[in-house]
Regions:
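N-terminal leader/linker segments that initiate helical-solenoid repeat arrays
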Residues: 19-69, 75-87, 91, 118, ...
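Amphipathic alpha-helical repeat scaffolds of TPR domains
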Residues: 27-31, 260-281, 305-308, 312, ...
């Protein structure tokens, strides 16, 4: 009996020691996992992964370790391994909501929609009170273009959680995207019959506007303003009703109210006015510039230092041909927002469009000092110098671009193309052609480079066979480009093929060539060589009218041809 009792005691002791050992091991591993989680939260992913890997190598039965391995993989954009880790976590704890939810979202983000849908549907069955699942499920159906299932899911949300403004807008959006406008309006009307919402009223008004039911739209906007007198969409919508019905006094009165409201920010207000300026007829600007000036003053008073207001005013003054005032606005914006690259780019683009080459070159270099990673600025400086005829400084800008390009092969090619043009103007033709050859190795079908290269060879009357082949490619690529047609036609003429050249020039004239003294002169030469003297002099006379020095000695040449024709 004593021996039996002793045996039982020994078993109990051994069992308790084993239990203690297991509990101690679990506590130790849990502490390691907690340390890994802390590292993860501190974005120390490498250290966190090392700890979790050690845990799982010792015992792969810890679901939390697999879960955080997955989260680290997500942060490192390794979706495939993240999915594997989450599946392992779920196999250890199949009821865990977060493991399954994370895997479902990961499937969705990696376009594995069938897997995502299956997992979301299971989650919705197991956790029917989580509204987020329904919305995300509907979004997946939308991405798949399955609007009917998306609408049915939205109806489930309404049945499960009740009607709300946000849900109504969501239902409206889905139905509208599906092309079922009637169903979309039903969702708005259903909500409006039971509740009051300025947002829903504005959506109803917007739909009436699309149907050209201006008076009904105005009624909805006014109802919305009765609920909230400063509701910006209703204020703007009401103003728009007056604008499109040509009631301009009321339009500007309501526009000013909208511009003064706190319900919209500067970006929204300037965005509306920019759209208006971009799309209105020129006579609108002429007729209502005093009223628009007031709108600009309102915005200036409210937002004296806002970049978007400077940009809007610069655009407005440009459209109304007050270029000095426009330049001042763009310049002030760039000066007062020196860290805002977009403000600087907008200013430089204005200088470019306004053809203020001296300012463009200086401001481009100054901008590059502030933004030394942005090669757009030496590009703009190069354009300025090039148009000033300062080819040496333009060339230096190109070299600056090349020194700061990195791996951008396309910009490398375009810069070499510009350098080729510059070298040609500097009469360094070998260097020019070397640049063009380098570009064509990168982009062999570049029509701009092919055309310039071919035309310059034609001007030198050398290697016309190569010039012919390059020019032919440009015309095949852009058959209606007058410049390319002119080059190809001129090469054919130089090759003694004026009859083949003639139709190319006729086509060039149909596509803008009549505005170029060079093209007109070339066509006249072709006609003259074919013995069509009267027509040749018609086009030479047109060339003389258009010429601004583009054809050196044109007047003298035409007179000489006239004398030749009389013999």
């Amino acid at each position: 009996m004593k021996r039996y009792i002793a045996s039982i005691f020994l078993v109990l002791v051994l069992f308790s020691m084993e239990l203690y050992s297991q509990v101690h091991k679990d506590i130790e591993i849990e502490n390691k996992i907690l340390t890994a989680v802390q590292k993860y939260n501190e974005n120390e992913f490498e250290e966190a992964r090392a700890i979790l890997t050690e845990v799982l190598l010792a015992d792969d039965g810890y679901d939390a370790a697999w879960y955080y391995q997955a989260m680290i993989s997500v942060m490192e954009n390794d979706a495939e391994f993240a999915q594997e880790c989450l599946r392992n976590a779920i196999s250890l704890d199949p009821e865990n909501y977060w493991y399954r939810y994370r895997l479902a979202t990961l499937y969705s983000h990696t376009d594995q929609m069938d897997l995502a849908i299956d997992l979301y549907e299971n989650l919705m069955n197991d956790f029917p009170k989580k509204s987020q699942l329904y919305y995300e499920m509907a979004d997946i159906y939308l991405q798949n273009g399955d609007y009917e299932k998306a609408l049915l899911t939205a109806e489930e949300i309404e049945n499960e959680f009740g009607m709300s403004e946000a849900l109504t807008i969501y239902q409206y959006r889905i139905a509208y995207l599906s092309g079922n406008k009637e169903r979309a309006l039903q969702s708005l009307t259903k909500y409006n019959n039971q509740y009051s919402s300025p947002t829903i009223l504005c959506l109803l008004a917007d739909n009436e506007m699309q149907e050209y039911k201006d008076s009904t739209a105005l009624t909805y906007y006014e109802e919305a303003l009765d609920l909230d007198s400063s509701f910006a969409p209703a204020l703007l919508g009401k103003a728009e009703v007056y604008r499109i019905t040509f009631r301009y006094d009321e339009y500007f009165q309501n526009l000013y109210i909208y511009l003064k409201t706190d319900g919209a920010d500067a970006i929204a207000k300037t965005g509306y006015l920019e759209t208006l300026l971009d799309n209105c007829e020129s006579n609108f600007l002429v007729s209502f510039s005093p009223q628009l000036d007031v709108a600009m003053e309102i915005l200036t008073d409210l937002y004296p230092k806002e970049s978007c207001v400077y940009s809007l005013k610069g655009l407005y003054y440009t459209y109304t041909q007050r270029f000095d005032e426009a330049q001042l606005q763009f310049q002030q914006n760039a000066r007062e927002n020196e860290d805002d690259i977009e403000a600087t780019v907008t200013f430089l683009r204005f200088l470019w469009v306004a053809e203020k080459w001296k300012e463009l070159s200086a401001e481009g270099l100054a901008a590059f000092e502030r933004f030394p990673y942005e090669t757009l600025f030496p590009e703009m400086a190069c354009i300025g110098y090039y148009n000033l005829g300062d080819y040496n400084n333009a060339l230096e800008c190109c070299k600056t671009i090349l020194d700061n390009l990195g791996e951008d092969e396309q910009k490398y090619a375009s810069t070499l193309s510009t350098m080729g043009d510059i070298y040609y103007h500097l009469e360094e033709t070998k260097k020019a052609y070397k640049c063009y050859d380098a570009v064509l190795k990168i982009t062999p079908e570049d029509p701009y480079v092919l055309n310039n290269y071919a035309y310059f060879l034609a001007l030198e009357k050398r290697n016309l066979k190569k010039a012919h082949e390059m020019s032919r490619k440009t015309v095949e690529a852009e058959p209606d480009n007058a410049t390319y047609l002119d080059t190809f036609g001129w090469i054919l003429y130089l090759q003694g093929k004026p009859q083949e050249a003639k139709p190319l020039f006729k086509k060039a004239l149909l596509h803008g060539g009549r505005e170029s003294s060079v093209i007109l002169d070339h066509y006249a030469e072709v006609l003259y060589s074919l013995g069509e003297y009267d027509m040749a002099f018609v086009y030479w006379n047109l060339a003389l009218q258009k010429d601004n020095g583009d054809v050196p000695g044109l007047k003298e040449k035409v007179e000489a041809r006239r004398q030749e024709a009389k013999k």
